[in-house]
Amino acid sequence: MSLDVDIQIASEEADLPSEEQLILWAQAALRETGDREVTIRIVDAEESRELNAQYRGKDKPTNVLSFPFENPPGLTLPLLGDLVICAPVVFNEAVEQQKTAAAHWAHMVIHGMLHLQGYDHIIDEEAEVMESLETELVTSLGFPPPYATNSSLAEG
């Protein structure tokens, strides 16, 4: 099982994660077997806002958008899909949530990769499964649990 990751940088932000980090985090979240391919595109707020408005009807930038690839009938390609991650939103959320930038970036890559593999968080039961898996994967990489509150971090 291998994952081929195409990294596209379309952001002016400084201090972006390295390609090696992005690939490591994407590989950590791969649940499917066989050879797979994914594109991770790092963008600024305007591109994220445009895509979020076009595909989700929300006229604001968002942290990560996932675009799963659907094989046409009779054709099997190894494509998982595309992730579009908005650098300024991820950096701002990390500060707001009192996380390191690396921890939040890892979480967003894992979150998006799970969406590409069919995980979702709209229904409570599905959200519990997805969030539990995200927590397991993020902590396996040495980061704190992504959904811990600031008070629970202070307590222990």
Curated annotation (Swiss-Prot):
A GO BP entry: rRNA processing
Top-tier EC class: hydrolase
PROSITE patterns: UPF0054
Alphabetic keyword roster: Cytoplasm, Endonuclease, Hydrolase, Metal-binding, Nuclease, Ribosome biogenesis, rRNA processing, Zinc
Compartment(s): Cytoplasm
Cross-referenced Gene3D superfamilies: Metalloproteases ('zincins'), catalytic domain
Cofactor mode of binding and number, as noted: Binds 1 zinc ion.
Lineage top rank: taxon: Bacteria
Entry's Gene Ontology cellular component terms: cytoplasm
GO MF annotations, alphabetized: metalloendopeptidase activity; RNA endonuclease activity; zinc ion binding
UniProt-annotated binding residues for Zn(2+): H111, H115, H121
InterPro entries: MetalPrtase_cat_dom_sf_prd, YbeY, YbeY_CS
E.C. number: 3.1.-.-
Cofactor(s) listed: Zn(2+)
Task performed by this protein: Single strand-specific metallo-endoribonuclease involved in late-stage 70S ribosome quality control and in maturation of the 3' terminus of the 16S rRNA.
Family: Belongs to the endoribonuclease YbeY family.
NCBIfam families membership: rRNA maturation RNase YbeY
Protein name: Endoribonuclease YbeY
UniProt source species: Hahella chejuensis (strain KCTC 2396)
